[in-house]
UniProtKB/Swiss-Prot annotation:
Binding site for a divalent metal cation 4: C32, C33, C43, C47
Chain intervals for the UniProt region annotation (Alpha): 29-60
GO molecular-function terms, A-Z: metal ion binding
Domain notes: Class I metallothioneins contain 2 metal-binding domains: four divalent ions are chelated within cluster A of the alpha domain and are coordinated via cysteinyl thiolate bridges to 11 cysteine ligands. Cluster B, the corresponding region within the beta domain, can ligate three divalent ions to 9 cysteines.
Chain residues that bind a divalent metal cation 7: C49, C54, C58, C59
Covalent S-S links between cysteines: none
Protein family per UniProt: Belongs to the metallothionein superfamily. Type 1 family.
Organism per entry: Cyprinodon sp. (Pupfish)
Signal peptide: none
Protein name (record): Metallothionein A
Keyword Zinc: yes
Length: 60
């Protein structure tokens, strides 16, 4: 099962303040944190989020 609700509802909610609408942000597989840091176009598959964004080391 996809841990990210994005694929089903078009909305990905990560905790209390990070929300992805219409899947415009790439969701990180493991924690479904939706927003990549500035300058990062895509999060690597299975990367782990730090806070409300992907760590830069998981960008690809």
């Amino acid at each position: 099962m996809d841990p990210c609700e994005c694929s089903k509802t078009g909305k990905c909610n990560c905790g209390t303040s990070c929300t992805c609408t219409n899947c415009s942000c790439k969701c990180c597989k493991k924690s479904c944190c939706s927003c990549c840091p500035s300058g990062c176009s895509k999060c690597a598959s299975g990367c782990v989020c730090k806070g409300n964004s992907c760590d830069k080391s998981c960008c690809q």
